[in-house]
Amino acid sequence: MSQPPQSPDAPGTTDVDGGVDSLADEVTSDVERAEAQAGDEDNHQQQAEPSDQRSDEHDEDYRAPVVVAPLPGASAEPPRSSAPAPQAQPAETPRPRHTALSLAAMASVAVAGLNPTRLALPQSETPERHIIGVIDTQGRHWEIHEARTDAVGASLEAEAEVLRRIGRVVDDGRLSFDVPRVAGSLRQKDAHIQVRSHVEGKPIPVETLRPGPGMSAGLGKALGEIHELSMTVISEAGMPVYDAEEVRRRWLSLLDDTAATGRTPPALLGRWEQALEDTALWRFRPTVVHGDLAEENVLVAGGTVVAVRGWSQAHVGDPAEDLAWVYSSAPVDCLDSIEDAYDIARSEGVDRHLRERAELVSELSLARWLLHGVRTGDKPVINDAVAMLEDLAAQVGDAPLVEPATPRLAPVPG
């Protein structure tokens, strides 16, 4: 999960010691080194690849290679709304850390005309990813994303393909919100960066939304527009595509794995199994799914949704996966406003079991969190997940998630 920006509506900036000229001067020497290394990499690549290899950057017919990992729901954060996570893979050794100045230098090589002058928000760092903001000499605000593992690098590249395609939809005026635009990337032996435009706005305060035509309706509209996107946005970007039955079977597999841990209340296992075996619940038309909706990925300004980011887990699947976050986070009195705006944005209407599946996804995300703890041997995560599962079991008791249909009998002739 990316960290929420710590800035207000206007982008914050941080001058390094010496101010603008200092950063520009220091970046210059790093740029020369980055250009030299990039040149070496290009020469090596030209020797290794056929000279007639086509470039995909500007080819409209280019179809990105299918990305096997990460699948939707592979996040190592507390679960929100994504599909089941795959088995944990052995951890990679992160690449060496690069300073903000080095990243700025590489960005100036990756994007022609990008001459950074000062640092800006966001500034976040994890063992797998480093993100910095910079302002260039033209006043443009950029984000530099450094991937420190191959898995994160693959995720960045896959997300870039999705962003390029959604960006075209935005430019055609068919979306009411913006997305980050990928301006360039640079891959070297010990570094992999991607440069994106910075999208303005603050994380949506979903827990304090109010009913009515403001942000609640704006959130519903944005979700509906996401689910109306052409599925080719995902399939041509090489991201996963699941039909309704595949979605159901993936959740069933997660249920089996959860039961095998012996840490889940039996009443919950029965509740989930009943819902997953109810075939009527799983008759839906797959849509584009964002896959990682959270406050920090939905940005607002002026009382409306202005941008959506964090598309690395996008896929085609069950729209209930996105709505699970809404139903578990938004105030109850806002749900009608969100749903009404969502319904209006959907051209073919909404299937009648969408809300029930969203509730199921929300509950199963706790099971996914438990499995993450078990697979990584993280006892605090296991204990946290077990506690949440026990709380949920106490809340729902023996009630089924979906009430079985009661057959209607004809009146007995009197």
What do the predicted segments below correspond to?
Residues 126-136, 143-144, 276-321:
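Active-site acidic catalytic loop and adjacent metal/ATP-binding pocket
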Residues 3, 21, 25-61:
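Intrinsically disordered, low-complexity, charge-rich segments with an acidic bias
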Residues 2-5, 70-73, 77-118:
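Juxta-kinase regulatory segment immediately upstream of eukaryotic protein kinase catalytic domains
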Residues 120-234:
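ATP-binding pocket architecture of kinase catalytic cores
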Residues 320-350, 360-378:
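Active-site activation/catalytic loop segments of kinase-like enzymes and analogous catalytic loops
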Residues 3-5, 70, 368-414:
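ATP/Mg2+ or Mg2+-diphosphate-binding catalytic cores
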Residues 188, 193-209, 228, 252-260, ...:
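A glycine-centered beta->alpha junction motif in the catalytic cores
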